[in-house]
């Protein structure tokens, strides 16, 4: 999503780094001022080592990761606001990202969904730019690429790849812009208030895109999928084999709006999971072969698109990078 420019400050590691603005550039081949560096020419050889170096500081900080594949499983629990940048030749999209973080383990093997995650975010105010995150386990079990379990999170030009339970938008307010999300079964799930703007969402097998877990009526959580492209893996016939979602918990709330829905979407649109569920499922102003709502089930009517204020609350432009 491209919004009017708003200058946001980003401090470096603290004692020696000066404040510098988030930069909108056609490429990012070197570290922004003040960032710790990871990679063959960086100070640290692993992302985990750079995270450890941040210690207990509460200052704003940033990490720049040079091109490469990093076989790591990382938890981000820094006490300050942290921004993580990946090297790329096109900052505006995930398509030319040169940094991949990958790990392979299923949830049963790890013990919990969170423990299976390649990247587990627990730090409020965290931002990630142009990084690919993969759980390589594949078909057969839940295996999470990203757990996003904090408030005011932003992911820009990132890629998240898995099969079942790829992206666990677990809790807090979250914003995904120009990202790629891949999976087959419940691959965007949880109970965050999450806005997905101008993302490519690709199913690689029959299944369900969302599995939202809103439980009680007083919870303000939503999944809003806005101006996104929903499609299937090239060469795989998924015609009418994918549902927009099913309710992991009884009051799931999801809207697809202003998006392109391909023929992979089943005419029924939505299906069931949680016993006794009365989900709030909406569609508004979508286009494409999968956008016909005449045979939809479990769907409620809505008179217009929902706003970012509705999903993320007032003041969202104080923590989202609106220059992106």
From Swiss-Prot:
GO MF annotation: an example: pectinesterase activity
Annotated pathway: Glycan metabolism; pectin degradation; 2-dehydro-3-deoxy-D-gluconate from pectin: step 1/5
Binding site residues for substrate: 142, 246, 248
Feature type site, description Transition state stabilizer: 164
Enzyme Commission code(s) on record: 3.1.1.11
Disulfide-bonded cysteines: none
Residues carrying sugar: 27, 191
Transmembrane domains' residue ranges: none
Catalysed reactions, as listed in the record: [(1->4)-alpha-D-galacturonosyl methyl ester](n) + n H2O = [(1->4)-alpha-D-galacturonosyl](n) + n methanol + n H(+)
PROSITE patterns: PECTINESTERASE_2 (PS00503)
Transit peptide in keyword set: no
Organism domain of life: Eukaryota
Keywords noted in UniProt: Aspartyl esterase, Cell wall biogenesis/degradation, Glycoprotein, Hydrolase, Secreted, Signal
Subcellular location: Secreted
GO CC term (a single one): extracellular region
GO BP terms: cell wall modification; pectin catabolic process
Residues the record marks as active site: 165 (proton donor), 186 (nucleophile)
Signal sequence segment: 1-19
InterPro entries with a match to the protein in the record: Pectin_lyas_fold, Pectin_lyase_fold/virulence, Pectinesterase_Asp_AS, Pectinesterase_cat
Free-text function comment from the UniProt entry: Involved in maceration and soft-rotting of plant tissue.
Family stated for the protein in its record: Belongs to the pectinesterase family.
PANTHER family: ACYL-COA THIOESTER HYDROLASE YBHC-RELATED, PECTINESTERASE 53-RELATED
Listed name of the protein: Probable pectinesterase A
Organism expressing this protein natively: Neosartorya fischeri (strain ATCC 1020 / DSM 3700 / CBS 544.65 / FGSC A1164 / JCM 1740 / NRRL 181 / WB 181)
Taxonomic lineage from the root: Eukaryota, Fungi, Dikarya, Ascomycota, Pezizomycotina
